[in-house]
Amino acid sequence: MQAIPMTLRGAEKLREELDFLKSVRRPEIIAAIAEAREHGDLKENAEYHAAREQQGFCEGRIKDIEAKLSNAQVIDVTKMPNNGRVIFGATVTVLNLDSDEEQTYRIVGDDEADFKQNLISVNSPIARGLIGKEEDDVVVIKTPGGEVEFEVIKVEYL
């Protein structure tokens, strides 16, 4: 497997979720399975089957997170010298030259992306267009809604 780029915050969130799943959720599910077994016949026991299904989802998520963390290339952008260039983990303020709107994005890994919080995946069209650009650069980015022209206003390594 290839390295998965991830910010320090993203890796911390995954570790927290993994800890929660292992220390809280897994024991809850095991207890639910044990309780459902006490009700007798497992073939027609809906509680048992539901708990087993939850166990499958939980164990699958644990394996998924462990795989991502073992292949993660954690990048702490705050430790890098800010040369004004857009890189993975950077917070970028751009001016949409078509709508004259200023927008701020943080370029993060796929698992961390949340457009509502302005966290965009490094593999998104906007991030791919901005990577490598510097302050005052103008770039035309092909988005699902058509071509959009942006000017890079500010690049921060927060």
Curated annotation (Swiss-Prot):
SUPFAM superfamilies: FKBP-like, GreA transcript cleavage protein, N-terminal domain
Disulfide bonds: none
Pfam families noted in UniProt: GreA_GreB, GreA_GreB_N
InterPro entries (alphabetical): GreA/GreB_C_sf (IPR036953), TF_GreA/GreB_CS (IPR018151), Tscrpt_elong_fac_GreA (IPR006359), Tscrpt_elong_fac_GreA/B (IPR028624), Tscrpt_elong_fac_GreA/B_C (IPR001437), Tscrpt_elong_fac_GreA/B_fam (IPR023459), Tscrpt_elong_fac_GreA/B_N (IPR022691), Tscrpt_elong_fac_GreA/B_N_sf (IPR036805)
An example Gene Ontology CC term for this record: cytoplasm
Assigned keywords, A-Z: DNA-binding, Transcription, Transcription regulation
Molecular function GO terms recorded: bacterial-type RNA polymerase holo enzyme binding; DNA binding; RNA polymerase binding
GO biological process: DNA-templated transcription elongation; regulation of DNA-templated transcription elongation
Function according to Swiss-Prot or TrEMBL: Necessary for efficient RNA polymerase transcription elongation past template-encoded arresting sites. The arresting sites in DNA have the property of trapping a certain fraction of elongating RNA polymerases that pass through, resulting in locked ternary complexes. Cleavage of the nascent transcript by cleavage factors such as GreA or GreB allows the resumption of elongation from the new 3'terminus. GreA releases sequences of 2 to 3 nucleotides.
Entry's family note: Belongs to the GreA/GreB family.
Protein name: Transcription elongation factor GreA
Gene name as annotated: greA
